[in-house]
Amino acid sequence: MIVRSFKDIEGTDRHVKAASGTWESKRIVLAKEKVGFSLHETVLYAGTETSMWYANHIEAVLCVEGEAELTDDETGEKHWITPGTMYLLDGHERHTMRPKTDFRCVCVFNPPVTGREDHDENGVYPLLTEPEEV
């Protein structure tokens, strides 16, 4: 059993701040735990815009605080995301988030991330793996 608090994560390599300055994420469960998914708490900052494309991952997102406009960049369809709303990127959709307020969400990724990922110039997380233990 693993028990981990946000306090345990703050100030460690599990507390990731995007190079873009638009979000930060606490990586609660990672690939090295070998459970088949990763779990994060992410905050996207008010007034920012983040374009993403999880070409290598499926992501489920549950908003727990704040409000944001989610745009499907492939169709142009817009959705207003508020607390209690979930969206699932089951088709690797290119999308853009525009938070009106600080937007806090819980995210699940499959395959799991290692914790070292940040979006590249295309908004993609690279598919990183943990080295095999000898």
UniProtKB/Swiss-Prot annotation:
Biological-process GO terms, alphabetical: ectoine biosynthetic process
Annotated signal peptide: none
InterPro entries: Ectoine_synth, RmlC-like_jellyroll, RmlC_Cupin_sf
MF GO annotations: ectoine synthase activity
Protein keywords: Lyase
Pfam families listed in its UniProt record: Ectoine_synth
Catalytic activity line of the entry: (2S)-4-acetamido-2-aminobutanoate = L-ectoine + H2O
Pathway(s) per entry: Amine and polyamine biosynthesis; ectoine biosynthesis; L-ectoine from L-aspartate 4-semialdehyde: step 3/3
E.C. code: 4.2.1.108
Gene3D superfamilies: Jelly Rolls
Keyword Lyase attributed: yes
Disulfide bond annotation, renumbered to this chain: none
Membership in a protein family: Belongs to the ectoine synthase family.
Function of the molecule: Catalyzes the circularization of gamma-N-acetyl-alpha,gamma-diaminobutyric acid (ADABA) to ectoine (1,4,5,6-tetrahydro-2-methyl-4-pyrimidine carboxylic acid), which is an excellent osmoprotectant.
Protein name, UniProt field: L-ectoine synthase
Species per Swiss-Prot/TrEMBL record: Streptomyces avermitilis (strain ATCC 31267 / DSM 46492 / JCM 5070 / NBRC 14893 / NCIMB 12804 / NRRL 8165 / MA-4680)
